[in-house]
Amino acid sequence: MIRPLPPELRGLLARGEVLLSVKDAVRELLENALDAGARRVRVELWGGGLERIVVEDDGEGIPLEELPLAVEPFATSKLQDLERIATLGFRGQALYALRQAATLKIRSRPRGQVGGGLLLARGERVELRPAPAPPGTRVEVLGLFAGEGRDPKAEARGVLDLLKRYLLHHPHLSLVLFLEGEARLLFPGAGLKEAARQAFGGLLAERLFPLEKGGAFALEGLLTGPQVSRTRPDLLFLAVNGRPVALPEGVLRAVRRAYRELLPEGHYPVGVLNLSLPPGAYRLRLDARKEEVALSKEAEAFLEEALEEAFRGQNLARALPEPRPLPALRPPPLPACPPCATWATFRESYLLAEAEDAVYIVDQHAAHERILFEELLARLREEGLKPLPYPVLVELDEEPPEASPLFGIEGFGPGRVRLLSAPPFLHPYPLLPPEIFRESLKGEGRSRLRGLLARLACLPALKAGHPLARAEGQALLDALLACETPWVCPHGRPVLLHLKEEDLIRRFGRRSGARAKEEPHPHPPRETTREGS
């Protein structure tokens, strides 16, 4: 039932503008439809939405006697408790704002009601009369932002982008968009993968792998692996309980940690994360945008764990061992890349290779680092710590720790510690353990262990400019492809670049690949812009 909000809630919610664009108007009406349980929504824009907006749904509808209250300020059926907001809309402001800025027509009928109602509203004038209507609600907005000289094409583009975003978070919604009477978006509610095709395009959608983890905290989504990334998280979309929201720093932090072995530092995946969280696991800012959230530490930890589980399921990464106790060595999963054949080197620093329908460019130093890093990691898991031939005394400028990820230690007075055991690969180098131990005091936990192993792998790795015979290059490539995470070096830099044949076809403006045998002769070149070249 629609009812006015009490004064104390009005004060908390009366912040910010509701309508700044046609996109804002469509978003508010679409959220009303979703909150009403709609399974099908039709959106029409005329003049980019500046002349007329139509949003029609098959939701539960509004009873005739409640229609006038629906366009009053701070009137809503959705908000009971600010701590337990379960709907997309809750402020009770959108229809009132539309009534003040444009002419508003609402035709609605609940399924159990005989006959519907038609409400006409503009400013302070409100007219209600019975009228035939199918089950659901149809809202028309006429003359929004009249006289402001807005660009209809820009407004329509904003709405199209908005609807594609909502499909990522409501992939079973049947949604159509008509621009000037022509169908621009037709989505039958075919699921998340098809929604991703609409939002990202078919080529990128094929490179997304699924995420799914259930429970009180749940995650569904799609993400790219190491082959695709961006230097900004502008194509990474988040929803909490169906609400599209901006990425809070806590989520970005969890994603960066989960991808730390897969992507270069400062890079982000492409995809969508749909989180379902219980009350208390997140906090929503109560402004007009309704898109800023803060997640609890528990929710952030759940997200990171869910991502890492998905990566292991895709053979993309494995977790580093906990410092103590060391887990047993497990058989490695299948290689993350298909077999490659090296056929050239460039400037004695890069290997050029091909595999199936792709070309790979491999940084030989970063590749050797990754190989050595995983060898050290495997030996640490398999061999653990072994007693040193004799204890090594180390003097420190700080209080010694109680434990170390790479050494067995015991205190030996103020600022002094004895190293009793170490990984076997350090035993032949008696001068290294004290230096490595001091280095191990920087950082914490797994990141500290990773940094130490990365440093140990970097020292003996092949350097740029070191010539390799073809057989040596092939051996290096084979060893890299046997790694569990061949995409980045231990420091987070890329190891290889990956170009699929379809990428080359698109860049060169061809119609098909060499294997397709569809064109007996090359077609003549065509003029291209920089963007299309």
UniProtKB/Swiss-Prot annotation:
Top-rank lineage group of the source organism: Bacteria
CDD domains from the UniProt entry: HATPase_MutL-MLH-PMS-like, MutL_Trans
GO cellular component term of the entry, any: mismatch repair complex
Transferase in keyword set: no
Pfam families, alphabetized: DNA_mis_repair, HATPase_c_3, MutL_C
InterPro entries listed in its UniProt record: DNA_mismatch_repair_MutL, DNA_mismatch_S5_2-like, HATPase_C_sf, MutL/Mlh/PMS, MutL/Mlh/Pms-like, MutL_C, MutL_C_dimsub, MutL_C_regsub
Molecular functions per Gene Ontology: ATP binding; ATP hydrolysis activity; ATP-dependent DNA damage sensor activity; mismatched DNA binding
Keywords from the UniProt entry: DNA damage, DNA repair
Record region (Disordered): 510-533
GO biological process, one term: mismatch repair
Positions with biased composition (Basic and acidic residues): 515-533
Gene3D superfamilies: 3.30.230.10, Histidine kinase-like ATPase, C-terminal domain, MutL, C-terminal domain, dimerisation subdomain, MutL, C-terminal domain, regulatory subdomain
Keyword Coiled coil among record annotations: no
Family listed: Belongs to the DNA mismatch repair MutL/HexB family.
Free-text function comment from the UniProt entry: This protein is involved in the repair of mismatches in DNA. It is required for dam-dependent methyl-directed DNA mismatch repair. May act as a 'molecular matchmaker', a protein that promotes the formation of a stable complex between two or more DNA-binding proteins in an ATP-dependent manner without itself being part of a final effector complex.
Name of protein: DNA mismatch repair protein MutL
